[in-house]
Amino acid sequence: MTAVVNIAAYKFVSIANPADLREPMLEQAGQRQLKGTVLLAPEGINLFLAGAADAIEGFLRWLRADARFADLQAKYSESARMPFRKLLVKVKREIIRMDHPAIRPEAGRAPAVDAATLRRWLAQGRDDQGRELVMLDTRNAFEVEVGTFRGALDWRIERFTQFPQAVRDNQAALAGKTVVSFCTGGIRCEKAAIYMAEAGIEHVYQLEGGILKYFEETDGAGFDGACFVFDERVALDAALAPQA
């Protein structure tokens, strides 16, 4: 059986009229028999799609022909079955809701740490400057329960809009440490890292590409359990395979 290719991708980029993209997205993804969800907002695009390999690549070629999405990076995995039941393209106020409009990743990101560097930091327990390393899980509590980085902070938030208050409540404990925010695919931890930096936390990084990119580029060292995903696969192990 030919494997189903799954992609997750996002980009923070100004979209003046996101509603104008909805029908073209539905048409291009639909004619390729892709399923999943695409979120469009004035701040950018966030998508999770699955289908045949050539269909996925064809859709990405079409999408990247738009200059706003030319450098869109996708994270890949495979599954034996289609993990989505239908195709949805939704227009939202934010592609990941935080309710802090001043946080605009397109205007400037927090520093990012790549998977290989993080793996080394985890092994040594410190960053390259010798600062204590703190892994901060920015996901919802039910996601964290499926799996997270060993020893990671879990503030037990129920939705991402609670993250800013959690930072205010816990900021003092992060002083002088290197904080790496992480999430499933990178989108939440990107906003989270910007918020923390603007709140005055000095040494803040985001995990480039999130947990999924860490699994893709390393052996998953330091991660306990599996990564929850919002589709019928439920969770992926470090080999990006659905957890049995």
Swiss-Prot record:
Keywords: Oxidoreductase, tRNA processing. CDD domains: RHOD_YceA (cd01518). SMART domains: RHOD (SM00450). InterPro entries: Rhodanese-like_dom, Rhodanese-like_dom_sf, TrhO, TRHO_N. It catalyses: uridine(34) in tRNA + AH2 + O2 = 5-hydroxyuridine(34) in tRNA + A + H2O. The keyword Electron transport does not apply. It holds the Pfam family Rhodanese. The active site is at C183 (cysteine persulfide intermediate). Catalyzes oxygen-dependent 5-hydroxyuridine (ho5U) modification at position 34 in tRNAs. This is tRNA uridine(34) hydroxylase. The gene is trhO.
